[in-house]
């Protein structure tokens, strides 16, 4: 079990990598994201307390209305795809292509499901 993923040496090495290499990267990313969110919250609180409160509210209304209009535009009635029944696989596609050309006739089980003309 020397090269197995369950071997003690492999597990120990992965644990060291997680602790010493990957975890600091995750911690730095978390700090960056929290700082970014903190800045956004501070900006929102400053703008709401300033004279531009009406402008901020109008911009929020515009954004929310544009999101609603985008969502309405996204709701397109598309025909539903049936998830039941046989699927085409590469073998069937190949058989259809080559049987149509008449180059090769295969007598196999899956060819009986092909539509015959």
UniProtKB/Swiss-Prot annotation:
The keyword S-adenosyl-L-methionine does not apply. Keywords: Nucleus. The keyword Nucleus applies. One of its GO terms (cellular component) is preribosome. Pfam families: YBL028C_N. It comes from the Eukaryota. Residues 107-117 have a biased composition (Low complexity). GO terms for biological process: assembly of large subunit precursor of preribosome. Signal peptide: none annotated. Residues 39-117 are annotated as: Disordered. Residues 93-106 have a biased composition (Basic residues). It is found in: Nucleus, Nucleolus. Disulfide bonds: none annotated. Belongs to the UPF0642 family. This is UPF0642 protein C32H8.05.
């Amino acid at each position: 079990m020397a090269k197995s993923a369950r071997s003690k040496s492999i597990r120990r090495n992965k644990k060291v990598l997680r602790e010493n290499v990957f975890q600091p990267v995750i911690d730095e990313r978390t700090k960056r994201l929290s700082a970014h969110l903190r800045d956004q919250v501070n900006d929102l609180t400053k703008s709401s307390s300033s004279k531009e409160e009406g402008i901020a509210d109008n911009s929020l209304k515009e954004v929310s209305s544009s999101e609603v209009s985008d969502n309405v535009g996204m709701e397109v009635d598309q025909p539903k795809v049936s998830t039941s029944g046989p699927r085409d696989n590469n073998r069937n596609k190949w058989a259809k292509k080559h049987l149509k050309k008449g180059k090769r006739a295969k007598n196999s089980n899956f060819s009986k499901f092909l539509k015959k003309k």
